[in-house]
Amino acid sequence: MAIERTFSMIKPDATKRNLTGAITKIFEDNGLRVIASKRVWMSKREAEGFYAVHKERPFFGELVDGMTSGPTVVQVLEGEGAILKNREIMGATNPANAAEGTIRKIHALSIGENSVHGSDAPETAAVEIAYWFSETEIVG
């Protein structure tokens, strides 16, 4: 498999419970390197822009409110097959359906407070990484 980069976000429900280190350790223990990371408090405008693809969905307002409720850690992860590997490590969006040992099974509170976000494809990874990081902030 090729070395890839993917975008990862540790959401406010997890940062409020001081889980940043525990979640990052899971990524690293599974062969992903953190090559960029910063802690941000999303503005409403940033959250609406980042999640614009969901704008017409009924949960959009609740999503924006949740993402602006506390600090978020945005990261770029790198490794072999990083996009798929990250998705496997995170587990299903709904923690009730997540496999044992995944981040969401271990740490998520609900489908709305599911602790992490990760890119689903190379194209979305590129867009999401560029949304939060300049090239000089990514140090591989």
UniProtKB/Swiss-Prot annotation:
Superkingdom in the source lineage: Bacteria
One Gene Ontology cellular component annotation held by this UniProt entry: cytoplasm
EC number: 2.7.4.6
One Gene Ontology term from the biological process aspect of the record: GTP biosynthetic process
Reaction equation(s) it catalyzes: a 2'-deoxyribonucleoside 5'-diphosphate + ATP = a 2'-deoxyribonucleoside 5'-triphosphate + ADP; a ribonucleoside 5'-diphosphate + ATP = a ribonucleoside 5'-triphosphate + ADP
Residues of the active site: 117
Record's subcellular location: Cytoplasm
InterPro entries: NDK-like_dom (IPR034907), NDK-like_dom_sf (IPR036850), Nucleoside_diP_kinase (IPR001564), Nucleoside_diP_kinase_AS (IPR023005)
A molecular function (GO) term: metal ion binding
Cofactors: Mg(2+)
Residues bound to ATP: 11, 59, 87, 93, 104, 114
Alphabetically ordered keywords of this record: ATP-binding, Cytoplasm, Kinase, Magnesium, Metal-binding, Nucleotide metabolism, Nucleotide-binding, Phosphoprotein, Transferase
HAMAP family: NDP_kinase
Protein name stated in the entry: Nucleoside diphosphate kinase
Source organism per UniProt: Rhizobium rhizogenes (strain K84 / ATCC BAA-868)
Classification lineage: Bacteria, Pseudomonadati, Pseudomonadota, Alphaproteobacteria, Hyphomicrobiales
Gene name as annotated: ndk
